Structures are given as C-alpha cells and as structure tokens.
Amino acid sequence: MRRTYGGQLWVASLAAASALTLLAARASAFCRSSTCQADSTCDYDEHGCPVGGHPTVWHRSCITFSVQEDGSPRMHITAEKAGQILEQAYGSWTNASCEDGTPSIQAFRLDPVSCNRPQVNLCDRNASIWIFHDDVWPYEDDDLTLALTWTHFDPGTGEILDTDVEVNTAQHVITTDPKGMGAQFVAIATHEIGHIFGLAHSPYLYATMFENYRLTNDMSELSNDDIQGICTLYPPDRKTGPCVPEPLNGFASDCGTERCDPEGCCSTAPGGNSGSKGGAMLLTGLGLLVGWRRRSGRRRSNLL
C-alpha cells in the first residue's frame, strides 16, 4: 500500500538520551515523545516530560518489524532468535490489559532484511529494522548506550511513519539466555518498543521506560505506569482503518534510494536531513543506558 502526505513532509528520528536525572516517583509517571524533540524546542514539565509540539503516535492499527539478516554473530544471536524474542517483547505491549480490552495496535514480524542502516524512504518501500552493531558503534560519546531507537514521523501531525532500532553489541555483552551474563536482550527490546509506540522515558524507577537498565528487576515486565501509557496512546476503542501489515509504501529488504528525485522525494537517515520541499527531517533517537551520565545540552536517552 502506498501512502502520500500533503504539504511538506519531514521525518524525525528521536534519540532519547535524555538527562540522566532521577526524578521522584509518582503514581502515574509515563511521558509521551513529541515532535519538538526533533529540533530541541520542547519545554519540560516538573517530571521531565516534553511539553510542546505534537505527541508522536501511530495512526494505523498495526505495524511491522524486521531483523537485519546478519543478527549478531559476536553475541551468537541469529536473526531468527532475535525475531522470536522481539515477538515476545512486542506482545508485552500489544497484549497489555487496558480497562476495556487491549491496546488498539498490533505488531507483525516480516522477513529478515539486508539493509543495515536506519532510514526511511518517503517515495519508496521500507522496513522497520532491528540492527546489531558487532564491530563499531557508529556514534561518538555513546559508550553507555545499549540501544537506540530512531522514530521517523510527520512533524505536522506527529504521525509515526517508520522506526528503526540499533543495538550496541560492539561495546556491551547482550544475551538471549535468561541466566546468561550481560544485559538481557528481551529487556532492552521491551524498552525500545515503548519508544517505537511513542513513549518517552519515565521518571518512575521501576517502569520499563525508565531510561537506565536495571539488574534489580525485569524490565521486560511492564509496570502499571507502562500499561497506563500504552493504553492511553492506543485505547481499545480508538477508531482506525483495517490492519495492513506492511511498512510505509510497502516492504523492501534493501535500503532503497538515498537521493532526492526531481519532485523532492527522498530518504532520510541519522546524520542528515533534507530541506527540500516534501523532504524528510531526522528527529534523533531514544535509547537505553547502562550507567549514569550527567545532563548535557542535548536530549538523548541511553539504556543501561
């Protein structure tokens, strides 16, 4: 299915390495991601939640994901194994118990893909990809980051169009063995999927969406705070169209075009954006940290 958007379309990739400040817990602490995080124009409330812009959310009733076909040889994680764990992690969110049912969004796994970088093609086919970086983590000053989610959206509405996740297996030991040493991939995945659905970091210490990885509890088990967040974003009675389980403009295994055509359609990826009419803007990413980092001038989230 091919979709078009009127006016100027920008895409942002939201790197949530927000300040590592421990805020007081409250009964309901979930925060929503916003378009204002793309250009750092947000204000922040007393709980650290972004204020301003449009909240980011999927308008459709189902989304898809794929694993990059190489998986992580260094961590002995095959694409198939990762896909199985991701199905479990997505299910934690989509099967959450809301007051009147379950969230009005589903997730479907598609075939592994050859594309090994995050991007969105506005005029071509796409894939929402989980990518493992075994050799080099491609971002500077990010040795604490376990994973990073890139959210591509329409800044005029906040509608999420595409997401990609990068996992830092170059600098961290990440395991799929529940008794193994290292960070649990299922916990990392569950946190990043919260970003995929439009949640920002929560100040609630025991939430899956807390920005730091914890060894003291299982982050793959949603807290009441996380459940309230997903049920608020996707209430069971939300009006949506029929489920079409394919990415924006259809599914592609390769990375597709990287240049704008004469009409202004293009792809966008971390590290660049297009100012052309109908082009795309990269928002930056949200992630999970393995440790504490002092507040810096930029907003980004690291999962520990």
Model-derived features: positions:
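Bacterial N-terminal signal peptides
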Residues: A12-T21, T284-G287
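Zinc-dependent metalloendopeptidases
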Residues: A25-G279
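N-terminal low-hydrophobic presequence detector
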Residues: R3-G7, H191, L304
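A cross-kingdom C-terminal cell-surface attachment/processing module
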Residues: G278-R295
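C-terminal segment of classical bacterial N-terminal signal peptides
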Residues: S18-A27, W292
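Cytoplasmic C-terminal tails of single-pass
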Residues: R298-L304
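Bacterial N-terminal signal peptides that target proteins for export
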Residues: R2-L14, G275-G279
